[in-house]
Amino acid sequence: EPLSPSQKAAIRWQGREGVTDCRSFFNYSRLTADDRVVWGSSEAAYYRGNGVGPQFDHAPAVYTALEASFARFFPALEGVRFPFRWGGPIAATTRFTPFFGALHSGRLLYGLGYTGHGVGTTRVAGRLLAHLALERRSELAELALVRKPPFPYPPEPLRRWSIEAVTRSLRKVDGGAAPGFLLRVLDRLGIGFSS
């Protein structure tokens, strides 16, 4: 619902700047033209076998977590309701960065894994894919996002177990803990946020 002038004053959000935090499972926010708060997160539910479809587009547990994080971030906005919700699948690589490449002797170009700040990434992705399509040598075409494919996810059931274990470990880091053994090993293998 739109914020009242007093609610906006209470949180000191005078402009319409986009806001994000720096956690592994980050939240982001902005004000719409009619002063509604768009509140989102990199939280995503994993469904066995990479399940996608309308039945997976809404995850009540994710919405509950979003409302709780909103209340912690904006305690002065207690009671603000969220009449609109949306969700859906995301594409994440094991490095949590996009990857670009070509198939069929360069006749098919692709970009995938736009996790997190994907909308902002599309501007650079368009330029990068144009350089690949034109076979133009450039700094963009030489990035690791093109040269170094992400490590593949393991097959089920190892995939689900590994995603759950990494998620638990990242939540501990978000809570202030140092990266544990699992995250350190994955980083050394070139898998994860720091790889």
Residue map of PLM features:
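Active-site substrate-recognition segment that forms the wall
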Residues: 1-5, 10-104, 185-195
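Short beta->alpha junction loops/turns
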Residues: 89, 114-115
